[in-house]
Amino acid sequence: RFSVRANVKEISFDQSSRAALQAGIDKLADAVGLTLGPRGRNVVLDEFGSPKVVNDGVTIARAIELPDAMENAGAALIREVASKTNDSAGDGTTTASVLAREIIKHGLLSVTSGANPVSLKRGIDKTVQALIEELEKRARPVKGGSDIKAVATISAGNDELVGTMIADAIDKVGPDGVLSIESSSSFETTVEVEEGMEIDRGYISPQFVTNPEKLLVEFENARVLITDQKITAIKDIIPILEKTTQLRAPLLIIAEDVTGEALATLVVNKLRGVLNVVAVKAPGFGERRKAMLQDIAILTGAEYQALDMGLLVENTTIDQLGIARKVTISKDSTTLIADAASKDELQARISQLKKELSETDSVYDSEKLAERIAKLAGGVAVIKVGAATETELEDRKLRIEDAKNATFAAIEEGIVPGGGATLVHLSTVIPAIKEKLEDADERLGADIVQKALVAPAALIAQNAGIEGEVVVEKIMFSEWEIGYNAMTDTYENLLEAGVIDPAKVTRCALQNAASVAGMVLTTQAIVVDKPKPKAPTAAPPQGLMV
């Protein structure tokens, strides 16, 4: 009988298990917390190749593995907070890590003093839910490019150039657009906006090329045939070819494949100048291919000739073809610029994709859906990041990625004062929330959240060389918009000064910190692999060495 034996485990209970978790959490949160605020420090990560200098919370969290297995379990929980916040909001990972550490620290003290962990967790959850409702009421919608620039600048570590670049890019591609970040071959950081819909398939044969110098097919006002069928017999498409030739319109065929007699005939007639045609393979695979072909059909006003709906290519009429104002095709990509035949249909399609995007849990599906929305909305901007060294390039790309995510989060749920001020102001609402809680331990949970909320603002001040408690005290007794600007060392209206955080980032940081803290507080034991004893090293040989 085949059997697998599990590794020997080490089990720790009660206070010793909680102390080990706390030690691991503290180590990771200390390393991540160094980067918080405009005067936060960098962390050097010794990775394969040259060391990496980073200022990004989630990157640091993911790089840390502690030698002690029990402490590493605690560190893994903070990694989880950072990753979850990064996935849902794209920024605020350091704030989430600091909040989680504080809630866990004060919570474990209460548990050790005899509080009921389940009631504590319930109190924390109720308090956080009430704070999120308050946050949603207080958030202000983004007004124009100046707000977008301020959000991006703060998130990129006060890099105004990045802020301006992202504001310009979003202005061009719109809120439904996609910003992609690539490495540049030069020292310059530039923005390029790609108009129209791009699909990652090029011409089937280079014989279709109309611009031999650039090896491109370039058409204007082309008719577009879209099908998921394979075209092998020329007789299937002769009626369409005759009609488009009479109209003197170029024809773009997007099909599963064009092969054999059909391809040979198209190429020969193209070279003779009889036909102005190009064939491209359909992008994607399976269900995604069908969805992308439907997107192209809606954009160009074509009727998608789907085999499973009984729409055969040989029966296609000229009215079922779409129109593309401009078509540019290289050996591996096709760009279509079209004026959507039906704006209502296009908007309905975009709304449907947005609904799918909000419901999916898959990161891969989210990226693909966002890409499809952007292509339909007609906006893809590429930020090409340049730097003098590989180390600087990596750091810059991470900052720009944070800025991009923060900007879209701000457009989605609005903005609040930055610099940790929002969390300090929210802490003043907690006494009113506590009054609605009847259980003593639940009220203790509310107190724990209140103490934790001031930690990010205190740490931002501390990283700037100022006494954190003094700063928190001043913010607490100020108006909602007033906070501490660590960059200029002044107390001012942060919304006017451009020190802004997206409300979504603050919300996700608070929710994820409370979620993981609740799990830690209700933990009573840790089970980890027992470290294997090291094999004794061989003694050096005795006697004369030659």
Swiss-Prot record:
UniProt keyword Cell division, yes or no: no
Molecular-function GO terms, alphabetical: ATP binding; ATP-dependent protein folding chaperone
Keyword annotations of the record: ATP-binding, Chaperone, Chloroplast, Nucleotide-binding, Phosphoprotein, Plastid, Transit peptide
Modified residues (Phosphoserine): 50
InterPro entries the UniProt entry points to: Chaperonin_Cpn60_CS, Cpn60/GroEL, Cpn60/GroEL/TCP-1, GroEL-like_apical_dom_sf, GROEL-like_equatorial_sf, TCP-1-like_intermed_sf
Record's subunit section: Oligomer of probably six alpha and six beta subunits.
Function: This protein binds RuBisCO small and large subunits and is implicated in the assembly of the enzyme oligomer.
Protein name stated in the entry: RuBisCO large subunit-binding protein subunit alpha, chloroplastic
Species the sequence originates in: Brassica napus
